[in-house]
């Protein structure tokens, strides 16, 4: 069963967008590695001084293997001045109301 991964870090969402647009090849490389480890869906969100990543993964282990060995993510986070990421995982609940 898949898991939802939520990553939150302090940072400027505009800097994240700027970096991603200026480094699209690096972003695609990271995405390719994520696919190899089982990402199902991925999206960045931004709020007041916060960057949030919402992903669905085949497994928590797949995400951890990807994140622990992906060298470009720490470089990107340092460049944009993001804070230490807080990562949480959630499992789907069987509530008979999925859309």
Q: Predicted segment positions?
A:
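Short S/T/G/P-rich N-terminal loop/turn motif that feeds into the first structured element of a domain
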Residues: 1-71, 79-99
């Amino acid at each position: 069963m898949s898991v939802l991964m939520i990553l939150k870090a302090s940072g400027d969402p505009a800097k994240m967008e700027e970096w991603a647009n200026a480094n699209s090849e690096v972003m695609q490389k990271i995405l390719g590695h994520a696919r190899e480890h089982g990402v199902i869906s991925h999206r960045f969100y931004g709020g007041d001084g916060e960057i949030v990543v919402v992903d669905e993964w085949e497994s928590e282990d797949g995400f951890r293997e990807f994140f622990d060995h992906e060298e470009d993510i720490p470089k990107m986070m340092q460049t944009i001045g993001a804070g230490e990421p807080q990562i949480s995982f959630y499992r789907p609940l069987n509530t008979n109301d999925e859309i």
